[in-house]
């Protein structure tokens, strides 16, 4: 009995060892993940990316809790999906909505502190300039400037070291080899950080690739910590929190004159949304593009459904020979990547050399302006998008037609129903319910079909007299892209975010209406 107990006691630690290893490995991995993400969070926060730092903290803390606690064991399987939804849907959505209430643009990207430091680093030439030559010596380099007929040289120094101050002294001759301009260009940063001192106390700094000059700061920070004094003109500048720029002030304390770049990001409330409705140069194209977006989405869904349903009915016809070949040929447009098909059609519709215009000109003597006429451009977009979308609808309809019992058609034939009555009273009612969610999804996809517009027409032909770039074939999503990245007056991310927020609300409202309508029709 004692020997049995002794054996159990000896085998107990060995049995528990694998479990201990698993626990150790688990916490080692979790600790490593926590340390890496913690370090990344510190880096992001130190660089001013507070939103991304907070996102990293939330996802990391959630991961450590889910994978470290036994209570949340079941949630480990859904955490990747939840994390992906937060990372790729909720965070971009919240970030975009947040930008919509700021003046964030190509001109206003920095924080106030960063804009101040950029302005304080600016200098202007306040005195005489002196040509210089960089000489390479046996133990380093020396800078030689020419003051009239006098040569002044610095002591030898190591280029690229931490030296920032050098004294000038007269020399009769210069030893060493003059460096070429490419050496000065490659070491411009190091040379620009060196101050040269004359014997009388004057200082000069590098002001060009061949000159040193007396350089002083253009702006000086005042005692209040935010006012800048222009040392060249004497005017005072303060940050204008309404526009996000430093601007001069008059004696009464009012902002006057032009703003000084770079700008900084400020909260401007609903100004971007008000611009959409109050600025006719934005409102009119926005309304026009919104109407076209809805029409484009609806017509695309209807045309692809009609063509797909007709072709599905044809290839399902048992008396048709070679049905398998026809199915393969009709599905091919769906198998070819969309961007390749779009670029091919762009060449086919070329107004001067495209095959489509060549055929139309040979048969009817016409050459439509597919890319310069708004109506023809919209027609071309619908034609190409229908070509890309009908195979998908055909595949869906083929499956749904197979699911309809043949007994229903036999019963309708006994009642004397013709083909049209079979379609409207048997086929369509049985197909429309399972098709409705897919049609809604197709509508939502085409509502934001950016790739189609960008590759085929790039939104053109352009509208005339608009404040922001807009085209007749632009969808709301491509219109937003052009405002954000192709604006003639600079990239306006705040306005683009406001329009993107409106698009989100519009698509959400349309989706709710469609779902309500679907539920009512089913009831």
Swiss-Prot record:
Protein source organism: Vibrio vulnificus (strain YJ016)
UniProt-annotated location(s): Cell inner membrane
Residues on Cytoplasmic side: 1-22, 70-81, 312-322, 402-434, 516-523
Segments passing through the bilayer: 23-45, 50-69, 82-104, 289-311, 323-345, 379-401, 435-457, 493-515
PANTHER family named among the record's database cross-references: MALTOSE/MALTODEXTRIN TRANSPORT SYSTEM PERMEASE PROTEIN MALF, MALTOSE_MALTODEXTRIN TRANSPORT SYSTEM PERMEASE PROTEIN MALF
Topological category with respect to the lipid bilayer: Multi-pass membrane protein
Periplasmic membrane side: 46-49, 105-288, 346-378, 458-492
GO biological process, one term: maltodextrin transmembrane transport
InterPro entries in the cross-refs: MalF_N, MalF_N_TM, MalF_P2, MalF_P2_sf, MetI-like, MetI-like_sf
GO molecular function: ABC-type maltose transporter activity
Pfam family name, one: BPD_transp_1
Subunit structure: The complex is composed of two ATP-binding proteins (MalK), two transmembrane proteins (MalG and MalF) and a solute-binding protein (MalE).
GO cellular component: maltose transport complex
UniProt name for this protein: Maltose/maltodextrin transport system permease protein MalF
ABC transmembrane type-1 domain residues: 290-514
Annotated signal peptide: none
Role: Part of the ABC transporter complex MalEFGK involved in maltose/maltodextrin import. Probably responsible for the translocation of the substrate across the membrane.
Keyword line: Cell inner membrane, Cell membrane, Membrane, Sugar transport, Transmembrane, Transmembrane helix, Transport
Main location: membrane
Domain of life: Bacteria
Family under the similarity heading: Belongs to the binding-protein-dependent transport system permease family. MalFG subfamily.
């Amino acid at each position: 009995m004692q020997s049995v107990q002794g054996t159990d006691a000896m085998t107990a630690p060995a049995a528990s060892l694998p479990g201990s290893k698993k626990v150790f490995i688990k916490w080692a991995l979790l600790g490593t993940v926590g340390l890496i993400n913690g370090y990344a969070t510190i880096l992001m926060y130190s660089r001013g990316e507070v939103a991304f730092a907070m996102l990293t903290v939330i996802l990391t803390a959630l991961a450590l809790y889910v994978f470290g606690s036994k209570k949340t064991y079941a949630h480990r399987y859904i955490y990747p999906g939840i994390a992906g939804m937060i990372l790729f849907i909720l965070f971009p959505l919240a970030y975009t909505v947040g930008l919509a209430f700021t003046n964030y643009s190509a001109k206003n990207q920095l924080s106030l502190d960063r804009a101040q430091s950029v302005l304080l680093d600016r200098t202007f030439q306040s005195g005489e300039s002196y040509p210089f030559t960089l000489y390479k010596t046996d133990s380093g380099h020396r800078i030689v400037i020419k003051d009239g007929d006098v040569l002044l040289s610095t002591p030898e120094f190591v280029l690229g070291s931490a030296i920032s101050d050098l004294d000038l002294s007269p020399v009769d001759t210069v030893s060493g080899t003059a460096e070429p301009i490419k050496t000065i260009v490659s070491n411009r940063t190091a040379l620009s950080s060196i101050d040269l001192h004359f014997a009388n106390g004057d200082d000069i700094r590098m002001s060009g690739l061949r000159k040193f000059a007396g350089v002083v700061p253009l702006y000086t920070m005042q005692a209040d910590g935010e006012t800048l004094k222009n040392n060249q003109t004497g005017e005072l500048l303060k940050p204008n929190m309404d526009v996000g720029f430093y601007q001069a002030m008059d004696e009464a304390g009012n902002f006057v004159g032009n703003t000084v770049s770079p700008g900084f990001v400020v909260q401007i409330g609903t100004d971007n949304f008000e611009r959409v409705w109050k600025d006719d140069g934005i409102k009119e194209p926005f309304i026009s593009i919104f109407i076209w977006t809805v029409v484009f989405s609806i017509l695309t869904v209807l045309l692809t459904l009609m063509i797909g349903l007709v072709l599905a009915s044809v290839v399902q016809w048992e008396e048709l020979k070679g049905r398998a070949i026809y199915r393969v040929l009709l599905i091919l447009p769906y198998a070819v990547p969309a961007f390749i098909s779009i670029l091919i059609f762009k060449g086919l519709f070329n107004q001067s050399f495209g095959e489509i215009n060549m055929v139309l000109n040979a048969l009817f003597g016409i050459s439509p302006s597919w890319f310069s006429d708004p109506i023809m451009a919209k027609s071309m977009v619908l034609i190409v998008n229908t070509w890309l979308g009908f195979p998908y609808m055909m595949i869906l309809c083929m499956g749904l037609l197979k699911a309809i019992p043949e007994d229903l058609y036999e019963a309708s034939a006994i009642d004397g129903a013709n083909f049209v009555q079979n379609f409207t009273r048997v086929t369509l009612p049985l197909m429309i319910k399972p098709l409705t969610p897919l049609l809604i999804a197709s509508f939502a996809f085409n509502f934001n079909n950016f790739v189609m517009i960008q590759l085929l027409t790039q939104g053109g032909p352009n509208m005339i007299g608009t404040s922001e770039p807009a085209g007749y074939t632009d969808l709301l999503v491509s219109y937003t892209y052009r405002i954000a990245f192709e604006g003639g007056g600079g990239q306006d991310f705040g306005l683009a975010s406001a329009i993107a927020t409106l698009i989100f609300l519009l698509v959400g409202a349309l989706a709710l209406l469609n779902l309500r309508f679907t539920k009512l029709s089913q009831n």
